[in-house]
């Protein structure tokens, strides 16, 4: 079916939980922008498309911009979107939906530059609007993030930059602005394999000239300490990032602890530098494999827990078989054993194998499936996929 704002509201209204408490982390969400569009419609009494046309597009002279609120409407000069095939050719890849606000803006590079020029001058809506648009978010921990009001604020080659990318189906776009140089670049492409951000910054390089910092201060050097081979071995093996259930592994090669093949620099007996990021293993774990904390250069923190390899027998896999239903998604899946492997089966009988990533967890068929038990029996399974951290399916059979 063609998705509309009515369908979006229906789906959102069925959600029972959040990925995290507001302010604990940052994760982009389309839903917030969809809800904003609906909110504008309810407050103004106008469609979001009409409100945008009269209050934003026409005042800014964006005469070739409109929302894709009816994907069947013929739009003059609209480019068809494509994506590459494995055979080296292209096939059409169009967005057949009417949901908009999060995306779905039909526009041109010229109109995008008119929009971002107003973010530079504030000619329309004034200085308070500009301040609000560029104010970066702050998490509960006090850490400032790059994301402001639909804008990413940061630096490119030492130059202050405000940018955002976008994509849907086979369309790709990137809009960047360098406020101190009064420079903006917009790139749009109708090929799903295009990288408009790279193209835009290549153009920007031609104009930024001497503003580019070619000798940025080097990251502070860290002095390596010596860690015995036996201690390094304690940190090896597979780990799960608890936030998104991704599986990662540490190994020791040529006397160095490695993460995904990259050698880490020991800066303490339990701390290892990974560029400007740091892994810190629990020093109080005793003889057991320790948990770890991964801190990114911008201060984001990921908890990592050790996980043992899981090589289940057919009898082990049978514990996970059954039907699981999600009222939130209005979907029911079956898990069955097929040819010695667990497989997720949809209502059409299509079976997709999933492989073990740890006890009670399997990867494949669109994400990671984490099974939960009560009283010695599997009762539910959570789907972790991209920005969905815990979509719960209850066992019904």
Task: Place the predicted regions along the sequence by residue.
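Short, surface-exposed loop or secondary-structure junction motifs
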Residues: 1-179, 203
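Structured C-terminal helix/loop/strand segments within mature extracytoplasmic catalytic/sensor domains
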Residues: 170-213
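Peripheral terminal and inter-domain segments
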Residues: 201-397
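Short, well-ordered beta-strand elements
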Residues: 163-164, 174-191, 290-295, 379-383
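A short acidic/small-residue loop/turn micro-motif
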Residues: 169, 192-194, 350, 386-387
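Structured loops at beta-to-helix junctions and adjacent beta-edge loops in soluble globular domains
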Residues: 85, 136, 154, 188-190, ...
């Amino acid at each position: 079916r063609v998705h509309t704002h009515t369908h979006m509201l229906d789906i959102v209204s069925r959600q029972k939980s959040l990925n995290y408490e507001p302010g604990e982390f940052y994760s982009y969400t389309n839903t917030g922008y969809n809800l904003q569009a609906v909110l504008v419609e309810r407050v103004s009494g106008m469609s979001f498309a009409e409100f945008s046309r009269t209050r934003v597009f026409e005042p800014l002279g964006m005469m070739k911009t409109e929302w894709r609120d009816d994907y069947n409407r013929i739009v003059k000069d609209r480019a068809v979107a494509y994506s590459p095939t494995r055979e080296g050719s292209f096939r059409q890849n169009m967005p057949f939906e009417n949901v908009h606000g999060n995306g779905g803006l039909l526009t041109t590079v010229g109109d995008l530059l008119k929009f971002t020029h107003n973010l530079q001058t504030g000619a329309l809506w004034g200085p308070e609007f500009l301040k609000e648009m560029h104010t970066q978010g702050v998490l509960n921990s006090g850490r400032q993030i790059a994301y402001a009001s639909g804008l990413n604020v940061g630096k490119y080659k030492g130059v202050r930059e405000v940018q955002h990318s976008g994509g849907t189906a086979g369309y790709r776009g990137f809009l960047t602005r360098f406020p101190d140089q009064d420079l903006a670049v917009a790139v749009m492409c109708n090929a799903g394999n295009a990288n408009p951000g790279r193209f835009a910054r290549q153009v920007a390089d031609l104009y930024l000239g001497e503003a580019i910092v070619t000798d940025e201060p080097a990251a502070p050097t860290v002095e390596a300490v010596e860690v015995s081979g036996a201690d390094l071995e304690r940190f090896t093996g597979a780990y799960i990032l608890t936030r998104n259930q991704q599986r990662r592994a540490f190994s020791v090669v040529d006397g160095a602890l490695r993460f995904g093949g990259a050698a880490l620099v020991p800066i303490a007996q339990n701390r290892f530098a990974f560029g400007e990021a740091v892994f810190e293993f629990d020093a109080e774990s005793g003889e057991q494999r320790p948990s770890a904390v991964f801190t990114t250069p911008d201060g984001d923190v990921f908890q990592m827990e050790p996980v043992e390899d899981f090589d289940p027998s057919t009898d082990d896999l049978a514990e996970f078989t059954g039907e699981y239903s999600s009222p939130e998604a209005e979907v029911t899946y079956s898990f069955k054993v097929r040819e010695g492997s667990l497989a997720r089966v949809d209502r059409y009988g299509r079976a997709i194998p999933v492989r073990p990533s740890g006890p009670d967890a399997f990867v494949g068929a669109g994400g990671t499936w984490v099974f939960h038990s009560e009283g010695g029996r599997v009762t539910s399974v959570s789907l972790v996929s991209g920005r969905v951290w815990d979509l719960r399916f209850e066992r019904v059979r």
